[in-house]
Amino acid sequence: AGIMITASHNPAKYNGFKAYGPDGCQMTDDAAAIVYDQIQKTDVLTGAKYISFAEGVAKGLIQFVGEDCKEALYEATEARQVRPGLCKTAGLKLVYSPLNGTGLVPVTRVLSDIGITDITIVPEQEYPNGYFTTCSYPNPEIYEALEKGLELAKKVGADLMLATDPDADRVGIAMKCPDGSYELVSGNEMGVLLLDYICAGRIEKGTMPKNPVAVKSIVSTPLADLVAKYYGVELRHTLTGFKWIGDQIAQLEANGEEERFIFGFEESYGYLAGSYVRDKDAVVGSMLICEMAAYYRSIGSSIKQRLEEIYAQYGRFLNQVDSYEFAGLSGMDKMAGIMNTLR
């Protein structure tokens, strides 16, 4: 079990922690309730113990992740390529922003490993800054978080602009159109595009497992159901929250069938293509988005053109996501009241 200290894709004032179980998946409700109950029993003035970071290291209570672990993660991520080697000759030109978060090293390392080296980083958003001074809401779902990246993409003529949120589990993109403008791709659109690309590519390469499984949240586009059915993939539906997608992987693993899992996504820009981790992963998402762009470019097509072909085949699905903020403890109570009324 462990925690990740992060504000995620939210404003800095929401800095807190995500709790993970021993399988690397965010805790589901029953386990989280046990942790929350213990927190409620702790007196914040007398019950919480404190030592300095340096003392924690000296006592062996804090240990740094070794290079062997990092290399294993990179290897597992790069193993999820659908068409290995394709990107080395694609000549893809990319602008990337880690939005002052943690994505810079892992994203650029993996992209470089698979052959994408023409990467321009948004300079103001290159290095970690927990105050998010360049955009107060570092969520790649919203236009404001992508503004600096889009400006730079237009300046250098990039084929794609990618942005990962500060804890690098969500990735947003803008694609270059024939007229030189840039069009944002929604999480629903990208989820369907990646599902289609992975299915078609793995069938072509003979790497599709028997009885493949994909997973999406119930609030994500039903277009994915049609795509999955076309390719003979079982598509499972979960409640909102990637922990439930991770839980589906755990259920497959319990039966020795985790290799059946090929892809999971949520409309909120979260993607995962493998069982090596149990949370949405912007590193593998960025890699597959770039590979997909390189592939369509190599056959004289584009991400935009493939999306239109998908709509022509299955029908056009329009989606709109509205976000509402309920601040503080009173906001949590208000949200709970709204949900109870809906139920």
Where are the regions a protein language model picked out?
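Phosphate/diphosphate-binding loops
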Residues: A1-D43, N139-A163, A168, V192-I198, ...
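Core alpha/beta catalytic barrel or barrel-like domain that forms the active/cofactor pocket
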Residues: T6, N10-A12, G47-I51, I121-E126, ...
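Conserved active-site and cofactor/substrate-binding residues in soluble primary-metabolism enzymes
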Residues: Q26, D30-I34, D68-A72, G101-P106, ...
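Cysteine protease catalytic core and zymogen-processing segment of caspase-like enzymes
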Residues: M27-T28, C177-I203
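Conserved phosphate/anionic-ligand binding catalytic regions in large, soluble enzymes, centered on
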Residues: A7-N10, L94, P98-V110, P166, ...
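Short acidic, glycine/serine/threonine-rich loops at helix termini
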Residues: K13-A19, Q40, V105-V110, Y131-C135, ...
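Phosphate-binding and adjacent anionic-ligand microenvironments
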Residues: K154, A158-L160, S181-E183, G201-R343
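Gly/Ser/Thr-enriched, mixed-charge loops and adjacent short helices
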Residues: N15-A153
